[in-house]
Amino acid sequence: MSSNTGDQFANLGKALSTTASVLFSSQPMEDTILSYSSPYKKLLHETITNAGGGSSLVKVRHDVKLSKGKNTGFQDIYSNSKEFFKNSYSDPKTTFKVLSYLSDDLLEDAPRDTIPQNKNMITENGEKRSAKSKKQEPTLFQGFEASLPVINETIELQQKLIMNSDMKPLTDSESIPVYAEEEEQEEEFSLPDHLKADKLLHSYSASFLKDASRSITDNLDLLEIQKNLAASEIRELDIKLEKLKMMRELVFKRVAKIEQHELFLEKHLNNVKDRIDMIIEYNMDKEYSSEDEENINGLSELSPKTGETNETYETAATTPLENKEEEHSPLLSKSIYQQLQDHEKKSDISERKKHSTSKKIKDVGVSHRNRRRKTYPTLQQFYDSGSKITSLPKAHDEDITCLDFDMPFGTMCSAGSLDHSVKVWDLSKKKQIATLHGHLASISCMQIDQYSTLITGGRDAVLKLWDIDKAMADEASNSSEDNDACLYTFDSHVDEITAISFDGDNLVSGSQDRTVRQWDLNSGKCTQTIDISFATGPMRSQRNIPLRNSVLLTKEPPAIGALQCFDAALATGTKDGIVRLWDLRSGKVVRMLEGHTDAITSLQFDSVNLVTGAMDRSIRIWDLRTGILSDVFAYEQPITSLHFDLDKIVISNNEPTVKIYNRKDGNHWFCGEDDPEQGNVDFVRYKHGYLVEGRSNGDINTWAI
């Protein structure tokens, strides 16, 4: 054994004897062992760090094989934390104390708090501390002690919820959650350490009162810590909510982008279906080949844009091939356009011109059967109820007379009181995409379906059937023909058309000539005329109601203010305030609903209820099964329009706000700001939680309801 090892064992023996004397002495162990001049510390230091580097701890490190190229510390040579303190000459506890000991020299560099620590967070007298003193943070133990009551309360509440989870609610009050009942009950507080308020007020013992004061002060300290902990949780929740809000915005934009993609694919899917119908109808089907693809690619610059296929087809059908070289051109020899021309050569062109109008009308019915949408927009349901989605300021120069849209974020058509045309809008892109010209006077009513079919009626006593897709294609290609999108014109009425409704192949229109006409959309012919006979006279309630900024001041209410048809059922609302239910198969009235005291301006029905609005300011809800009035309510101004679904009824009455009535719970609320400078709402349309309203200043707004 070397001399270094012998000295090491000798020093270790001295250290062990010193340790035994410390353990059996009456002086505190920490003061003896960890003092700067401790003989125990000195002997152990000499034992472990013996001169010459012969200590066991140093040998262990040199004996371990370290991997090359890695920067490892002393702790990295052991697989777990316990092996870090193992050696051949001392137990792990002793080694831990030695290795974790910090001398006074090292502690001199540690930052010190010049302000003495005050255990009390507030003074006993409840006075605020001096502004110069720094705020003392609670210790870890104080925070743990303050959180214990909250933890216990949470555990008790959880136990109550578990105990009540198996109990079936027998009454409405028993079905209320336990935590809700706890919140409704008044909170009772008590003094700490079972102190009684009466005893404190009547006690003359100074020591008892001092102890009580300290106890209450300590309790206030704990409450202050609890409050700070709760405030910290609120701040953390606010941060999390902000992050969740940002994430929601990102996902919201993703949904909007996906729905835009769906609309794009739906549009091209409809074009493909129309193409298939045309090929099948004219028996032009053939096998697809690579040469067809080359010819189509070669014609891509010459072929019309999307939506112009029908126009190209009609032009090819009526234009003969005069150039022989063009007829044998390799570019067109095997293209589908050449087949179209060859097919039309064999057909009777004059006969096609004769029946071209009836074919357009027939295509509307075919379109309805084939164009079934696979997807529908749902983005509106992710907006807050009553929030504005978009705005189209000054969409028209004057007030909006009528508007309609096919689906949320889809296509909208609108008309103004001084316009003789219809404007077509893309609600998702918030811009005008087409204009429909053809009426000779202002347009008073319109309806659009989800298949891009629009029917309008105006003061020129005509109805027009429009193809919106064709209008958008013509607008995109800068077509010079204004009436290409008009498929048909119905012109049997002799006065202004005030109301229309179409369902499937049937179209019903009401006019100031006091007739209701039924049209066949397959042939364009009027199949039935119903005369509406009622006595005329001054409207009683209207004369006593002051209107503000209303177009109703300048004209009398229409003879037929509203109507709706479904299959063989027809409902009409007229100037005499009576709702008539008709059977279109017989052309006779089957029921009359009386109750309004003025002209009816709007109505709508579903399978159960009929809702009517009139100039007597009232909304009436009728039960169609019994003909009895189910509900009635009124507003301050006459009703101009209404629309509803299974959940809500939206109403306009020449006021700045849209009135909303919840059909399920009966609640009334307003949508928009009550600001007269923004104009009054004249017309509303509502579908699938998506509201579009037109105002007297020409603005159009969309809302999430």
UniProtKB/Swiss-Prot annotation:
<feature type="region of interest" description="Disordered">
    <location>
        <begin position="290"/>
        <end position="310"/>
    </location>
</feature>
<dbReference type="InterPro" id="IPR015943">
    <property type="entry name" value="WD40/YVTN_repeat-like_dom_sf"/>
</dbReference>
<feature type="repeat" description="WD 4">
    <location>
        <begin position="547"/>
        <end position="594"/>
    </location>
</feature>
<comment type="function">
    <text>Involved in mitochondrial fission. Acts as an adapter protein required to form mitochondrial fission complexes. Formation of these complexes is required to promote constriction and fission of the mitochondrial compartment at a late step in mitochondrial division.</text>
</comment>
<dbReference type="Pfam" id="PF00400">
    <property type="entry name" value="WD40"/>
</dbReference>
<dbReference type="InterPro" id="IPR001680">
    <property type="entry name" value="WD40_rpt"/>
</dbReference>
<feature type="repeat" description="WD 1">
    <location>
        <begin position="395"/>
        <end position="435"/>
    </location>
</feature>
<protein>
    <recommendedName>
        <fullName>Mitochondrial division protein 1</fullName>
    </recommendedName>
</protein>
<keyword id="KW-0472">Membrane</keyword>
<keyword id="KW-0677">Repeat</keyword>
<feature type="compositionally biased region" description="Basic and acidic residues">
    <location>
        <begin position="125"/>
        <end position="136"/>
    </location>
</feature>
<keyword id="KW-0853">WD repeat</keyword>
<dbReference type="GO" id="GO:0005741">
    <property type="term" value="C:mitochondrial outer membrane"/>
</dbReference>
<feature type="repeat" description="WD 6">
    <location>
        <begin position="634"/>
        <end position="671"/>
    </location>
</feature>
<keyword id="KW-0175">Coiled coil</keyword>
<keyword id="KW-1000">Mitochondrion outer membrane</keyword>
<feature type="region of interest" description="Disordered">
    <location>
        <begin position="342"/>
        <end position="369"/>
    </location>
</feature>
<feature type="repeat" description="WD 7">
    <location>
        <begin position="676"/>
        <end position="705"/>
    </location>
</feature>
<dbReference type="InterPro" id="IPR019775">
    <property type="entry name" value="WD40_repeat_CS"/>
</dbReference>
<feature type="coiled-coil region">
    <location>
        <begin position="216"/>
        <end position="250"/>
    </location>
</feature>
<dbReference type="InterPro" id="IPR020472">
    <property type="entry name" value="G-protein_beta_WD-40_rep"/>
</dbReference>
<dbReference type="InterPro" id="IPR036322">
    <property type="entry name" value="WD40_repeat_dom_sf"/>
</dbReference>
<feature type="repeat" description="WD 5">
    <location>
        <begin position="595"/>
        <end position="632"/>
    </location>
</feature>
<feature type="compositionally biased region" description="Basic and acidic residues">
    <location>
        <begin position="342"/>
        <end position="351"/>
    </location>
</feature>
<comment type="similarity">
    <text>Belongs to the WD repeat MDV1/CAF4 family.</text>
</comment>
<feature type="region of interest" description="Disordered">
    <location>
        <begin position="110"/>
        <end position="136"/>
    </location>
</feature>
<keyword id="KW-0496">Mitochondrion</keyword>
<feature type="repeat" description="WD 2">
    <location>
        <begin position="438"/>
        <end position="476"/>
    </location>
</feature>
<feature type="repeat" description="WD 3">
    <location>
        <begin position="492"/>
        <end position="529"/>
    </location>
</feature>
